[in-house]
Amino acid sequence: ILQKAVLDCLKAAGSSLSKAAITAIYNKIT
């Protein structure tokens, strides 16, 4: 469920900068 939400955010963001930021946060959580 959480992973689907992250992918949804990545899709909504669309920008590589936001994608990198979300990826960094996601890696920090896991």
Swiss-Prot record:
Compartments where located: Secreted
One annotated Gene Ontology cellular component of this protein: extracellular region
Domain of life: Eukaryota
A Gene Ontology BP annotation from the UniProt entry: defense response to bacterium
Positions of modified residues (Threonine amide): 30
Main location: secreted
UniProt KW keywords: Amidation, Antibiotic, Antimicrobial, Disulfide bond, Secreted
Subunit structure and binding partners: Homodimer.
Role description: Shows antibacterial activity against both Gram-positive and Gram-negative bacteria. Its antimicrobial activity is optimal at NaCl concentrations below 100 mM, suggesting that the antimicrobial actions of this peptide may take place intracellularly rather than extracellularly. Has no activity against the fungus C.albicans. Has modest hemolytic activity.
Protein name: Dicynthaurin
Organism name: Halocynthia aurantium (Sea peach)
Organism lineage: Eukaryota, Metazoa, Chordata, Tunicata, Ascidiacea
